[in-house]
A protein has these predicted regions:
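Extracellular/oxidizing-compartment recognition motifs
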Residues: 1-477, 486, 500-505, 522-529, ...
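Alpha-helix capping and helix-loop boundary segments enriched in small/acidic/polar residues
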Residues: 146-150, 166, 171, 197-201, ...
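Alpha-helical support elements that line or immediately flank enzyme active sites
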Residues: 170, 174, 348-367, 421, ...
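Active-site acid/base region of carbohydrate-active enzymes
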Residues: 179, 261-266, 272-273, 425-459, ...
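Active/binding-pocket-proximal capping segment
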Residues: 180, 188-191, 195-196, 511, ...
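Non-catalytic C-terminal accessory modules of carbohydrate-active enzymes
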Residues: 247, 252, 264, 268-292, ...
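C-terminal capping/lid segments that line or modulate ligand- or cofactor-binding pockets
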Residues: 285-289, 479, 497, 547-549, ...
Length: 871
C-alpha cells in the first residue's frame, strides 16, 4: 500500500504558504485497508517532526508544532496495509514564505504626476459622456458639485538592476497594491495571471513566492515589473466605484539568494508610464498601443511608503489561463462582425493580425446575441446605476506596422461573443479566447441517458470556472462580487464538481475581515462598492449571513480539517449571536408564547430571492417571512456540531438548546400545529430540509408539496434559498417520479429551459433568455447549478462526510441510466445504475481504505469493501 495525492494545507507542493502547523493529507493506493502510517517532516538535514508508527485508517493529520517562515521542507509518508505490511515511502515538498518582520523593502509607488491620457480611446469613448451627464444631474439637483471625468490610467513599469551572487536557492517574494507581472532578465516570472489576487486590500494583501533559481544569474541582473489597477482601484461592481482600496498602485518585493536579500523594493528604482498598456481597468478593459513595444522611455524617480500593511503568504491556488477557444467569425443582421467562441466564460481574447501602423481594432465582449441575432451587452442591466454607464468589457489595439500580437494583462471579462470594430483586413487574423480561473481540477463528472441533463452539469462546471477567479463571485460581468448567499447554497455542489477548498478558504478570510462589529455579515467580501444607506440593513439578512456557518461546516465535513472551524469559529459565533439578537427583539404585538423570543421577525432579509412571481421588494418586505427563524434553528444545530468538534462542550449545549427553541418557535409562528398552510413551495421545502417538522408532519408537507408541483405543471416555483433542496425532499418522501419530472422539465421555470435555449453556463434567473430570444440579467451564475448536488447525492446517491461514505441511489426509468464519478478527498468514488426492462443493475466503486454503506431502493443494505461491485 502506498500514499498518493499528498497535499499540504490542501495544496499540492505549495510555495510560500504561511508559517504554522501543517495539515497533511493523502490517499491510499493498492491494498484494502490502511492500518497505520508514519510521517517524517524535514527541512534539509533537520527533522521537524516524526510521527512514528501511528495506528489507524485516517488519511490526514496535523503537525503538532509550527513550521517556521522561509522553510524549504519535505514530508514523506509510508502506510501499513491490512496485513500489517509497510509500503514504499511517498514524498511531497512545501515551502513557507516570509513572516511580516522578514520584509525589508518598502512600498514603491511609480506614479509621481498625473499622466497625459488621450480621452478618445475605447474606454473613455464609452464612459465619459455618461459620467458628464450624471455629474451635471448631480449639480443640478443641488446634492453636490460636478467632478471632472478621470480617464483610466496606463500601466506603470518599474525597473531595477542588481547584482546577485552564485547560489543554490533563489526566491522572489512579491505583492502589489493593484496587479503585477514581473520579468527577470527578459523572462516572465511564473505563470500566474492577475496576481496577487483579490483582497480587502486596505486591510491586508497576500504575497506570492517564486522559485527564480533558473532566472537569476551570478553578476548583473535586470528586474522589470508592470503594475495595473486590478481590484485595488479599478471600476468595480454595479455602481462603478473606483479607488475602493486606495488611489496609488504600488509594489513590494524581496529577492533572496540562499536566504539573504540581494534586491528589495526601495527608492533605488525607476518607473515609467510610457509603455504599450495605455489604459487598464479590471471591469472596463484595456487600451494597448503596439507602437510603444520594445525599449521603454520616460523613466523617472519613484515614491516610497513604509510597509505597515499585513502581508500573508500564498495560501491558495494561482489564477491561470486554462482552456483556449478559437473564434468563429459571423456577420449579424445589423452588419456587425462578431466572434463566437462557443462557450460562455470568464477570461480575455488574444489576437494576432497584420495591420498598418496606427490602425485600430476594438473588441466588445458580451454573453449573448439579442432576439434579432445582433451583439448586445444590455443583459448586464447596469447602464443607469453604473457611474461609467455600465460594464464596458472593451479591448482596443492600436497597431504597429506589420505583425501584431496582443493579449490583455490586467483585465478579465465574462463573454461568449465579441464584436469586432475595425477597418483592418482580418484575413488570416487569429482570435483566441482564454478561460481564466483559479487552478482547480474538475473532480465530479456525471453522465446519463438524457443529453440535456449532461449539458446542465457541464454548464454548472463552467459557471463555477467562470466565477472562481481567486474568490467565488456571483457573475464575471456586472458585479463580480463575492456574495455570501451564493456560496452558502452552492458549497456542497461546488466541492463535488471541483477541488475548490483553497479558493473558498481564502474567501472566508475576507468574510472575517469584513464582518461588522455587531456580528452582521457583509453580503459581499471583499467589497466591490462603497456602502450605501441600505448596506448595513441588508447585511443582517438570514441565509446570506448564515454562509459564515454553512460554508466552513461543509469544508470540514468533506476533509476532516478542524482548522477551518477554528479559524472561523469567532465569526460564526458573532453572526449567530446577531441573528439570535434579532429574535430577542420580537414584541408581543408580533408574536406571543414561550418561544416568541426565538422568532426572527425584525430586521431586513432578502427572503426567498428570485422566487418566480415574487418581486425582490415583496420578498424583502414580507412581515411574516419565516426565513430567519428557520436559519436560527438550522444554523444553530450545525454550530452545536462545530463546537463539539472543537471540544467546546458548553458552547455546543447552548447552541443545541437555542436551535431546539427556534424549532418550536417556527412551529408556533409559521405552522398550524405542525401543518404548513402556505401556497409557496419554498415554505414546504425549507421546513422539511431543515428538519423543522416531525417525521409524520414532514411526510404530510411533502404530500402537499408534491401536489403543488403537479398542479404547477411540474414546474418549480422556488427561489434562491430553497431550490437546492427541492428534488431531494421530494425523493426522500416517496416522490422520486415528481423530482425527475422537475429535473427533466424543459419549459420555464426549469433547469433544462436554459439548456434548450443553447446555454453553456447557468443563468442568474430562470428566463435569462426569454422565449423571444431576448437576454436579461447575468447568463453566468453558478447558484442554480446546485441541482447537481442532487444528481450526485440523490440520483447516484453518493454522500461523503468525514470518515463516512454512504451510497443510496434513486434510479428512475426516466433517465434510463446514470453514472457519477467523484474524485473525493479519500479517493475515487463511482456510483451508477442502468435499467434493462424493469431490472436495475448497480455498479459501485469504493476507494481504497474505505467501506461504503449502501442502501438500495428495494430495501437492501450492504457494506461494500474497496473495489468495483455490480449488484
Amino acid at each position: 500500500m502506498q500514499a498518493t495525492n499528498l497535499k499540504t494545507n490542501h495544496l499540492t507542493q505549495p510555495l510560500g504558504i504561511d508559517a504554522g502547523t501543517l495539515f497533511l493529507s493523502w490517499q491510499c493506493a493498492e491494498g484494502v485497508r490502511q492500518t497505520a502510517y508514519e510521517i517524517e517532516v524535514t527541512a534539509g538535514a533537520e527533522t521537524l517532526w516524526a510521527s512514528g508508527k501511528a495506528l489507524g485508517s485516517v488519511m490526514h493529520t496535523e503537525t503538532p508544532s509550527a513550521v517556521p517562515p522561509k522553510t524549504q521542507g519535505r514530508w514523506r509518508i509510508r502506510l501499513w496495509d491490512e496485513n500489517d505490511q509497510p509500503g514504499a515511502w511517498s514524498t511531497a515538498s512545501f515551502e513557507t514564505g516570509l513572516a511580516q518582520a522578514d520584509w525589508q523593502g518598502v512600498w514603491v509607488c511609480p506614479e509621481t504626476e498625473e499622466p497625459d491620457i488621450d480621452c478618445a480611446d475605447a474606454i473613455n469613448a464609452f464612459a465619459k459622456p455618461n459620467w458628464e451627464q450624471k455629474q451635471a444631474a448631480l449639480e443640478a439637483s443641488g446634492k453636490g458639485q460636478a467632478q471632472p471625468y478621470q480617464p483610466h490610467r496606463p500601466a506603470s513599469y518599474l525597473r531595477k538592476t542588481f547584482t546577485a551572487p552564485a547560489g543554490e536557492s533563489k526566491r522572489l517574494y512579491i505583492t502589489a497594491k493593484g496587479l503585477y507581472a514581473a520579468w527577470l532578465n527578459g523572462k516572465r516570472v511564473g505563470d500566474m495571471v492577475l496576481a496577487p489576487g483579490s483582497f480587502t486590500a486596505d486591510k491586508h494583501l497576500g504575497a506570492q513566492t517564486y522559485d527564480v533559481t533558473a532566472l537569476v544569474r551570478e553578476g548583473e541582473n535586470k528586474l522589470l515589473i508592470a503594475l495595473g489597477d486590478g481590484w485595488y482601484r479599478s471600476t468595480s461592481g454595479v455602481d462603478g466605484d473606483r479607488d475602493l482600496f486606495g488611489k496609488e498602485v504600488a509594489v513590494l518585493f524581496q529577492l533572496e539568494v540562499d536566504g539573504k536579500a540581494v534586491c528589495i523594493s526601495d527608492d533605488d528604482m525607476e518607473a515609467t508610464q510610457c509603455g504599450p498598456i495605455r489604459q487598464n481597468d479590471m471591469q472596463q478593459g484595456e487600451v494597448y498601443d503596439a507602437r510603444l513595444e520594445g525599449e521603454l522611455s520616460g523613466w523617472h524617480d519613484v515614491k516610497t511608503e513604509p510597509n505597515s500593511l499585513p502581508i500573508t503568504g500564498m495560501n491558495t491556488v494561482p489564477i491561470r489561463e486554462q482552456e483556449a477557444f478559437a473564434g468563429r467569425l459571423l456577420r449579424t443582421p445589423n452588419g456587425e462582425t462578431v466572434l463566437d467562441f462557443g462557450q460562455n466564460m470568464a477570461g480575455y481574447v488574444e489576437m494576432k493580425l497584420t495591420a498598418h501602423a496606427g490602425q485600430k481594432l476594438r473588441l466588445l465582449c458580451g454573453e449573448a446575441l439579442d432576439e434579432n441575432g445582433n451583439f448586445t451587452q444590455e443583459n448586464f442591466q447596469d447602464r443607469n446605476r453604473h457611474k461609467e454607464g455600465g460594464t464596458a468589457q472593451m479591448l482596443e489595439l492600436v497597431c504597429k506596422e506589420g505583425e501584431n500580437h496582443y493579449k490583455p494583462s490586467f483585465t478579465i471579462m465574462g463573454f461568449r461573443y465579441t464584436k469586432v470594430e475595425t477597418d483592418i483586413d482580418l484575413t488570416g487574423a487569429e482570435f483566441t479566447a482564454h478561460a481564466v480561473y483559479s487552478e482547480m481540477p474538475v473532480t465530479g463528472s456525471f453522465a446519463c441517458g438524457d443529453a440535456d441533463v449532461d449539458q446542465l452539469v457541464k454548464n454548472s462546471v463552467w459557471s463555477q470556472k467562470g466565477n472562481f477567479c481567486d474568490i467565488p463571485t456571483d457573475c464575471p460581468t456586472r458585479e463580480r462580487a463575492g456574495w455570501t448567499g451564493d456560496m452558502g447554497v452552492f458549497i456542497e455542489t461546488g466541492l463535488t464538481l471541483m477541488d475548490c477548498y483553497p479558493v473558498v478558504e481564502k474567501w472566508l478570510a475576507e468574510c472575517r475581515l469584513n464582518q461588522y462589529p455587531d456580528g452582521r455579515m457583509a453580503n459581499i467580501a471583499p467589497p466591490t462598492s462603497r456602502p450605501g444607506y441600505m448596506t448595513p440593513m441588508l447585511c443582517m439578512s438570514a441565509g446570506w449571513g448564515d454562509a459564515a456557518i454553512l460554508v466552513p461546516y461543509a469544508l470540514y465535513k468533506r476533509t476532516g480539517d478542524r482548522k477551518i472551524l477554528a479559524d472561523n469559529y469567532q465569526m460564526m459565533q458573532k453572526w449567530y449571536a446577531f441573528l439570535l439578537g434579532r429574535a430577542q427583539q420580537t414584541t408581543e404585538e408580533q408574536q406571543t408564547g414561550a418561544y416568541a423570543k426565538y422568532t426572527v421577525l425584525n430586521g431586513l432579509d432578502y427572503g426567498e430571492w428570485c422566487e418566480p412571481g415574487i418581486t425582490p421588494m415583496q420578498a424583502m418586505m414580507n412581515p411574516r417571512k419565516s426565513v430567519g427563524t428557520a436559519y436560527l434553528a438550522y444554523s444553530g444545530r450545525l454550530l452545536a456540531e462545530i463546537a463539539q468538534a472543537l471540544g467546546k462542550a458548553e458552547d455546543a449545549a447552548q447552541y443545541r438548546d437555542t436551535a431546539e427553541k427556534a424549532v418550536k418557535a417556527y412551529r408556533t409562528a409559521f405552522t398550524d400545529n405542525g401543518k404548513i398552510t402556505s401556497d409557496r413551495q419554498c415554505e414546504y421545502v425549507r421546513a422539511i430540509a431543515f428538519a423543522l417538522l416531525g417525521e409524520e408532519e414532514s411526510q404530510a408537507a411533502a404530500d402537499t408539496l408534491n401536489r403543488m408541483v403537479a398542479e404547477n405543471g411540474y414546474h418549480l416555483n422556488t427561489g434562491f434559498l430553497s431550490t437546492p433542496f427541492l428534488c431531494e425532499v421530494l425523493a426522500k418522501y416517496g416522490y422520486a417520479d415528481t423530482a425527475y419530472k422537475l429535473l427533466l422539465q424543459d419549459t420555464a421555470p426549469s433547469w433544462l429551459y436554459e439548456v434548450k435555449q443553447g446555454a453553456t453556463t447557468v443563468w442568474e434567473t430562470w428566463t435569462g433568455i426569454d422565449a423571444n430570444g431576448h437576454p436579461s440579467e447575468s447568463l453566468n451564475h453558478y447558484s442554480y447549478g446546485a441541482i447537481c448536488g442532487w444528481l450526485f447525492g440523490g440520483v447516484c446517491g453518493i454522500h461523503l462526510a468525514g470518515e463516512t461514505l454512504t451510497i443510496a441511489p434513486t434510479p428512475n426509468p426516466a433517465l434510463g441510466w446514470a453514472k457519477a464519478v467523484y474524485d473525493s478527498p479519500v479517493g475515487r468514488i463511482e456510483s451508477g445504475w442502468q435499467y434493462a426492462g424493469d431490472a436495475v443493475t448497480y455498479t459501485i466503486t469504493v476507494p481504497c481504505n474505505r467501506t461504503a454503506e449502501v442502501t438500495l431502493p428495494d430495501g437492501r443494505s450492504l457494506t461494500l469493501q474497496p473495489g468495483t461491485h455490480t449488484l
